[in-house]
Design a protein with these regions (language model features):
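N-terminal auxiliary segments of SAM/dcSAM-dependent transferases
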Residues: 1-21
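Class I SAM-dependent methyltransferase SAM/SAH-binding core
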Residues: 65, 74-119
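A short acidic, Gly/Pro-enriched loop at the edge of an enzyme's catalytic core
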Residues: 118-129
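A short glycine-rich, Lys/Arg-flanked "PGG" loop and its adjoining helix->strand segment in the class I
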Residues: 143-158
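Short, glycine-/aromatic-enriched active-site segment of Class I SAM-dependent methyltransferases
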Residues: 165-190
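Short alpha-helix
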Residues: 191-207
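C-terminal helical/coil "lid" or tail adjacent to the Rossmann-like core of SAM-dependent
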Residues: 217-262
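C-terminal lobe and adjacent flexible extensions of AdoMet/dcAdoMet transferase-like proteins
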Residues: 248-282
């Protein structure tokens, strides 16, 4: 494993990370989707699963890649909802084991593999859909990642991402230290490649067409604000403090996306793109 793979796997294998996701987000590793009728995080997470599944528009015959599958929450939901063939890929060995354990009662069940979704062993034109839920910040080379998604998609295949953009180009020195912290301690090697417009630009340069962005910011921010509130006792720990590496998620919640949103430097978007039908693998 290289530095990038080790850094991401180490973050998600850390007790404070996976235990926090389990207790606070119900094993999900993404924000919830809040409406005027949503009362709690559990409902928001269920909303997110439904909303994202609706946007995917899967057919039972589709072969689907969950790129950065975490503990397999979305993969299991999609198999149950659509009957599609879903393969989850993660570079964290622990997540493969947990995902397989949580899916063993299912028929059919999603399949999980260990690997880096930026450099896979899948054949050309293998998948109908590739989706991502908040893991592009771990992609060290965003352009290479989009090229890989393009390679493994069939002509007419689609990408759907629920992820954020951060305007790192206009951050203060203090905010830049938070970006440094994400890279050093949370595997955020791609976060500075998520400036406004950069993900869509990477999709376009990879060859995708019909690229769209839908703003989900206001629907997901209650989760980020909630995480910030829960981390308030740790707000005094700055990202460059010696104690910070021992409280990674708390520091991220205190000084990360909620505060960047208030500064106008954070948006959460649903990205879509299609591989043209005319393409044929070289």
């Amino acid at each position: 494993m290289d530095k990038t793979t080790n850094g991401v796997a180490a973050y998600y294998s850390r007790f404070g990370s996976w235990a926090g996701y389990n207790m606070v987000l119900g094993r999900s590793q993404h924000a919830g989707y809040w409406t005027s009728e949503t009362k709690n995080e559990q409902q928001a997470q269920a909303n997110f699963l439904r909303m994202f599944a609706k946007e995917l528009q899967l057919k039972p015959t589709d072969r689907v890649l969950d790129a950065g599958s975490g503990q397999g929450v979305m993969a299991r939901h999609l198999v149950q909802a659509n009957g599609s063939e879903v393969i989850g890929i993660t570079i964290t060995p622990r997540e493969v084991k947990i995902s397989e354990k949580l899916s063993r009662h299912m028929t059919p069940a999603p399949r999980f593999v260990l690997g880096d979704y930026s450099h896979t062993d899948f054949p050309d034109e293998y998948f109908d859909v590739v989706y991502v839920n908040e893991t592009l910040s771990h992609a060290k080379d965003m352009q290479a990642t989009m090229q890989e998604f393009y390679r493994i998609l069939k002509p007419g295949g689609r990408v759907v991402f629920a992820d954020y953009e951060v305007d790192a180009r206009h951050m203060s020195a203090r905010q830049q230290r938070m970006m440094d912290f994400l890279e050093q301690h949370a595997g955020g090697f791609g976060v500075r490649q998520q400036n406004p417009g950069e993900i869509s630009q990477a999709l376009q340069q990879a060859g995708f067409a019909d690229i769209s962005e839908t703003d989900w910011t206001e629907a997901v921010m209650p989760t980020y604000h909630r995480l910030r509130s829960l981390a308030r006792p740790f707000a005094w720990i700055q990202p460059d403090a010696k104690l910070a590496p021992f409280f990674v998620n708390a520091v991220m919640a205190s000084h990360g996306y909620s505060t960047l949103y208030e500064a106008g430097l954070f948006r959460y978007l649903l990205y879509k793109g299609t591989k043209p039908l005319a393409h044929r693998a070289k």
